[in-house]
């Protein structure tokens, strides 16, 4: 599942777009019975690969023609409002009773193309040309020594087929039957395909509460799949005063899946804990060890890499679900993460591979999507020093002071650390409390109350103790 969010107006809420990828089981040899509005199925067979390939190549050639026409008429399009670009290009290439096309070759070459497919091709071609023009304009502004290779207009080698409202038949979706209009080399006709009953029931159920958008056909590892897209609108927390929020501060870790704490603006920590997903973590470690065994034996390990990737993905899914479960139980208004860009060289010795596989951005994206559906907001703070500094203000922590011996060697427990005052504490849990403190300190600064606190670099050295010992500033109340 992949989610794409688009912010709307306050009246309409936030638009959340979700994609579900469903595999096609087989192709149906069927004809539509208009009297009973059912399919007369005479047989089942493998998906016709040549049919899909011909349709994709046909549309790809149409995109190539449209991009050439748009490039030639780019100066003309600059005088047209952007909202009318699609209709303007349609008039340039398609002749009607009231319009004579400037490029009649399109109708001759693609005379059987449906109108909705033509509009899809025009939209894709406009996006390609517009991106090329913007990249080329940026390239020209650079100095000759910094330019590099000149941007080119590239047509993708593969074209994903998108089916709009007019050309998809989803009325039989509850029965697991979908209809797609495809090109067989001579004409466009309806072809029907079968998906699993469980997938069909799930899509039919979520389609009652969400708007179905245009599905897309894609081929992954030799199998055809349909990507169904849905849109829904959700109202988020409308309170603009963030000092009234109850937040869930999250520190995503490597030793543990995540550490969290629930906090309010007066510095009170209502709940805290560490998420340990032992089943998923053990599965991932086992797959990593299996991969090493394959590499040491000189065996082909392509399948093992896929196992590791899938185990890692399942770990991120379980982490996101656990965080959302805690947020729902605690009834928080906002979930606060660290801003993790992941740039720079990765250090860490034996943990280097785990850092490479750290799906921090994937977990944050999944939590963001699920939180928005529940009306919660998402915020991020500066990550520097959250784990390095103790939440009680005692200074930097020591992560090499907690260890035990195995086979005569020291084995450090990096989940625990020692504060300067001698206290042994969970390092990630301390970081989670610092993350929550930085969120509220930032809001205090925006409210004009930072004069109540010590003058330290706000984005790097702030810890929980900074505003706990000072109390709730009256200026911010």
Report the location of each language-model feature.
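Nucleic-acid substrate recognition interfaces
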Residues: 1-477
